[in-house]
Amino acid sequence: MVTLQEVKQYLRIDFEEEDPLLLSLLATAKQQVMSVGRMDEAQLSEHEDTARTAILYAVSYLYEN
């Protein structure tokens, strides 16, 4: 759904040192969105545009804080 490259572009990161951290934050953000939205993988895919925005927002929040 959301790739590491999309996260890096969203956060304006162009170096690779934080890739492991970003991948971890991406997984956490996806789980948060699924939990808060009470969705499974299939439902997340049905609402892909909204879920993508929510996941990117969550990754950004986790990265900055």
Predicted regions and their residues:
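Divalent metal-cofactor coordination and adjacent catalytic microenvironments
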Residues: 1-65
